[in-house]
Amino acid sequence: MFSWLGTDDRRRKDPEVFQTVSEGLKKLYKSKLLPLEEHYRFHEFHSPALEDADFDNKPMVLLVGQYSTGKTTFIRYLLEQDFPGMRIGPEPTTDSFIAVMQGDMEGIIPGNALVVDPKKPFRKLNAFGNAFLNRFVCAQLPNPVLESISVIDTPGILSGEKQRISRGYDFAAVLEWFAERVDRIILLFDAHKLDISDEFSEVIKALKNHEDKMRVVLNKADQIETQQLMRVYGALMWSLGKIVNTPEVIRVYIGSFWSHPLLIPDNRKLFEAEEQDLFRDIQSLPRNAALRKLNDLIKRARLAKVHAYIISSLKKEMPSVFGKDNKKKELVNNLAEIYGRIEREHQISPGDFPNLKRMQDQLQAQDFSKFQPLKSKLLEVVDDMLAHDIAQLMVLVRQEESQRPIQMVKGGAFEGTLHGPFGHGYGEGAGEGIDDAEWVVARDKPMYDEIFYTLSPVDGKITGANAKKEMVRSKLPNSVLGKIWKLADIDKDGMLDDDEFALANHLIKVKLEGHELPNELPAHLLPPSKRKVAE
C-alpha cells in the first residue's frame, strides 16, 4: 500500500550516477533546475537558460578596464603573437567585444554568425540585438595558450554620458552576462594615470556578485618610481574599497605586461614575482573549471529558489478581479517587506536575494496575473539536487582534478618563465651557484669554520645541542631550523661536521634573505666530501 511513496523516497536518497562532471551538470540543470526557472519566468528577470556549450566550453578570462589600460596588449603578451582584429594605441582602439579562441586557421567570425553556432557558448547574446552583435566578433587562431583557455577582450570604458549612450546597447548588462560565464575577471588599471570614472565604477558594481572571480592588475607600473608606485597602489586600494563592498581585499597584481624593456627597472624583481603569481592563477583555471561550473550552478539554483518565492508571493497578494493596478504598485513599492517576510519564513540568507532596485524596475513591466502560485514539488526537486546530487558530483570533481596536471596552460608567455636561466628564481636563494664549478658554500666557509671550532668539536663533529646554541641566534622559528638541520645532516648521524655546519649556515642565510627553503637538498649544495655518500 502507498508503494509510490517509498519509490519517491528511494529516488530522493539515491543520487544519480554520472560519468563526467560536465555530463552531470547538463542533466541536473535540464531535469531539475530548468523546470523551476521556466515556471517562474526566471529568464526574463535574471539570466537566459543555459545550453550544452555553457558546460562544455574551455575556461574563459574576461578583461575589463578603461581605454588604453593595456587590455589588448596584455592578451598579445600572453599569446606572444598578434590576433585577428587586434588594434593597439593610446586612443580608444578596441571598439568591439573580441572573443579570442583556438582555431585551425586565423580568421574572424562576425557576431551574427557566432550566435547561431551551437558549439560556441554565445547563442544567448542575440538578446542584445544587432547594435551589440555588430560590435562582437570571435578572433580564431592556432596558439598553444588558447588550447586551454579563451580570452574576452572588451571595449575600453569611456567617461561621459554621450559615449555611454551612443554604444546602442546595454554595456553593463553585456559585461554581466559574460561575468556569469567566465572563470576569471581581470580588471586592468593604468598605474601611470590612475582614474576610475563613474562609468567604470558602475561596471564594477554590476559585477559585484562575482567578486570571487575578480583579480586586479595595476599595469604599466614600470613608468613610475617606487615611491610614486606605493602612492598609486594605496590610492587604488582606497578607491576599490569604496566600490567593492567586501570585507576581503581583492588581489592586486603589479607589473608591466608587455614585451618591451622596462622604462624604470627598479622594481624588476617585484614585477617578476607578481607576474608569476598571476600566471599561476591563470594556469589553475583549467584544473578548477569543473568546480567553477558546479559553483555557478549552485549559485544559480539558490537565486532561482528565491525568485520562485518572490513571484509566488506577489501572485498570492494580487486580487482576482478589481484594483489590480493599484495593488501592483503597492506590492512593487513594498518589495523590501516581501523580501523580509520570505527571508524569515524560509530561513534564506539576505545575500541570496536579487538586487531590490533592479527587481522593482523589472516588475513594473510585468503582468502579475501571469505569475504562478507556489509549486512545492518543483522546489523540492531543486532542494534534493542541492542536498544529494551536488554532493555526488563533488566527489567526481575531485577525481577529475586529481587526474589533471597541475599546470595545463602552456605556450606563449607561460613557456618563457618555466625553463632555463630566465625561469623565475633561477640562480637565487637555494639555487645560487647552480651553474658554478665550485661549491657555492666554500665562499663563506672560512667564516663558518671559525664559529665551528669554538663549539668544541669531537672527532671533527659537533653535537646537535652545540649546533642548536649557534643556530637559534638567527631567531628563526624552531620549525624552520628543524628543516635546515634535516637538510644539512646529510649522513643522518645526529651531528654536524665542518662542511655540514657550513651548509646549515648557508641555508640560514638563504632563509634570512627572504627565500624559501627547498624540500630536498639540491645537488649543487651537496658538499664535495659528501657527494659519494649521497650517491
Curated annotation (Swiss-Prot):
Binding-site residues for ATP, renumbered to this chain: 65-72, 220, 258
GO biological process: cilium assembly; early endosome to Golgi transport; endocytic recycling; endocytosis; Golgi to lysosome transport; protein homooligomerization; protein localization to plasma membrane; protein transport
Annotated spans, G2 motif: 91-92
Pfam families: DUF5600, Dynamin_N, EH, EHD_N
Phosphoserine: modified positions: 349, 456
Any one of the GO CC terms: cytosol
Membrane topology of this protein: Peripheral membrane protein
Tissues and organs where the protein is expressed, per its UniProt entry: Highly expressed in heart and brain and moderately expressed in kidney, liver, and placenta.
Segments of this protein annotated with the region G3 motif: 153-156
Domain called Dynamin-type G: residue spans: 55-286
Positions bound to Ca(2+): 489, 491, 493, 495, 500
UniProt cross-references to SMART domains, sorted A to Z: EH (SM00027)
Keywords, ordered alphabetically: Acetylation, ATP-binding, Calcium, Cell membrane, Cell projection, Cilium, Cilium biogenesis/degradation, Coiled coil, Endosome, Isopeptide bond, Membrane, Metal-binding, Nucleotide-binding, Phosphoprotein, Protein transport, Transport, Ubl conjugation
Residues covered by the EF-hand domain: 476-511
UniProt-annotated stretches for the region G5 motif: 243
UniProt comment concerning the protein's domains: The EH domain interacts with Asn-Pro-Phe (NPF) motifs of target proteins.
Annotated family: Belongs to the TRAFAC class dynamin-like GTPase superfamily. Dynamin/Fzo/YdjA family. EHD subfamily.
Name of this chain's protein: EH domain-containing protein 3
